Amino acid sequence: MDGSCDCIEPLWQADDLLVKYQYISDFFIALAYFSIPLELIYFVKKSAFFPYRWVLIQFGAFIVLCGATHLINLWTFAIYTKTIAVVLTVAKAATAVVSCITALMLVHIIPDLLNVKLRERFLKDKADELDREMGIIRTQEETGRHVHMLTHEIRSTLDRHTILRTTLVELGRTLALAECALWMPTRSGSALQLSHTIYNSAAIGSVVPINLPIVSKVFNSNRVVKIPHTSPLASITADKSRYVPPEVVAIRVPLLHLTNFQINDWPELSAKSFAVMVLMLPPDSAREWRPHERELVEVVADQVAVALSHAAILEESMRARDLLMEQNIALDAARREAEMAICARNDFLAVMNHEMRTPMRAIVSLSSLLLETNLSAEQRLMVETILKSSDLLATLTNDVLDVSKLENGSLELEIAPFNLHSTFTDVVNLIKPVAACKRLSVVVTLAPELPLHAIGDQKRLMQIILNVAGNSIKFTKEGHVSITASMARPDALRGPHEPDYHPVVSDGFFYLAVQVKDTGCGISPQDMPHTFRKFAHPENAGKWNSGSGLGLALSRRFVSLMEGNIWLESEGVGKGCTAMFFVKLGMPEKPNANLRRMAPHPLQPNQGAGGPDALSISIMDSNPRVPRVRYQSSV
């Protein structure tokens, strides 16, 4: 051979070395190709879910065929037969077919595999997001736990100072604060005063003007507000930071219902007042306020406001209870005094009643005995007047002295048939001597339709007429007094000042209307509402016309018992007065013989039964300065 040829001699020692290395390499390649499918089959069987099993089978077949070609290649390094060449050719052809099919399948599989990677990234992001949410949830749970604990501590008492002290201490312990303080409004409301701190590192009572911009900023927000560490509100500790200033926040605390709320003597505050809570983190640290810590402070501030409101309401309730107890004690003492006074009054009335009834019975008895003797008509009229006056005085004594009986409503009417005309005759006989002393004329007019007999309480009716007519005579210096009696019309039963009076007209009953009119001193509009009160005296009555002041009050009570109504009318002082009353009386079907015998003589105009000149009577006034007057008959 030519010396320039770069060929390897077949029998050269180097050829054997290369063949040897190729032989070994093909062997290990074939071994690796055969082991890879076994590993794939093993892990696929172990996998519970794998969507590309046919791809793995094709890929395994491709690897096996590749390994087979390398294995068959081991026999080609020496002289080999045609059979080996055929087998090698078939193996390579099969490998080519399988590799092409696998390559085509990978065109569809690779995008899916890429999507799997994207899904993996998406799931990883979702997992990270879930981790963050779980962290937030854990933080919220922790915050809620702290809020529940703080709320429990705050609401464990209803003392306002204890509430504030507990709030600051628990916040400082939960949030690891360097200091926590509360600024309260002063009495004037123009400044904030330091009232509570945790460690008392600042002077209690320090004052900050309320018109500072930072204070207005805190008041105008219901959230936590970050304030500079150099702010006057942040001057709650004496410790100064060397390197990093502390983080300081403030929040307003509404004073919802705090009256008498002040420092040591808490001033009265309106419902729109605010306190300021200041919270400071430790200085010289990299710690900052986190969102859940801010939320915790906001919730606690609201709880403190509610707790302070409840405490204030409780204190007000306790003050009201104490005041009520004092009033009850005073009322109980007054009740005991009133009971003692009532007992003393009843004892006095009982004694006076007994002492007045004893001589009254003697007068009635002697008058009754005199009526049984031979008397002239004039003497008999005088004795009858004495007897009736004594009987009426006994009735008046019973009513006036038994005040408790009148006040508790236990007074009852004595219903019986009586002669109605005779009642007016008796009234005239009683009042005409008094009118004659004052030279007053008394005119009595009885309507023709007025029945002769009626059913009711004659003594009470007579007492009403005497009280009203007696008042007219008492307050009239000159002129006349007229008494008019008739059956009342239904439309005239209501007085001008009694809109709530509703009379009931029924069969067998009628309303007696009595009008007493005088030309006396009259009643002023100011005195009109007080005329029916007990012990009431008109200002224009004068000291000579003073009396007990019970007449009209008793008359109104009797009129009410008789289902009637009474009122007064006057145009003013010096223009006279008109008294009008209605009482309900029964109408008897057949008057008995006694009533017929009691029928009086008809009253003549301007004259009562007997006339003024037919009497000789002594008249005594309740005023001791009025002299005794004796009116003697001129006949």
From Swiss-Prot:
Residues 159-308 form the GAF domain. The chain crosses the membrane at residues 24-44, 59-79, 94-114. Ethylene receptor related to bacterial two-component regulators. Acts as a negative regulator of ethylene signaling. May play a role in the regulation of flowering by up-regulating GI (GIGANTEA) and RCN1 and regulate starch accumulation by down-regulating the alpha-amylase AMY3D. Belongs to the ethylene receptor family. InterPro entries: GAF, GAF-like_dom_sf, HATPase_C_sf, His_kinase_dom, HisK_dim/P_dom, HisK_dim/P_sf, Sig_transdc_His_kin-like_C. Homodimer. Coiled coil: none annotated. It comes from Oryza sativa subsp. indica. It is a multi-pass membrane protein. The lineage of its organism: Eukaryota, Viridiplantae, Streptophyta, Embryophyta, Tracheophyta. This is Probable ethylene response sensor 2. Residues 351-589 form the Histidine kinase domain. It catalyses: ATP + protein L-histidine = ADP + protein N-phospho-L-histidine.
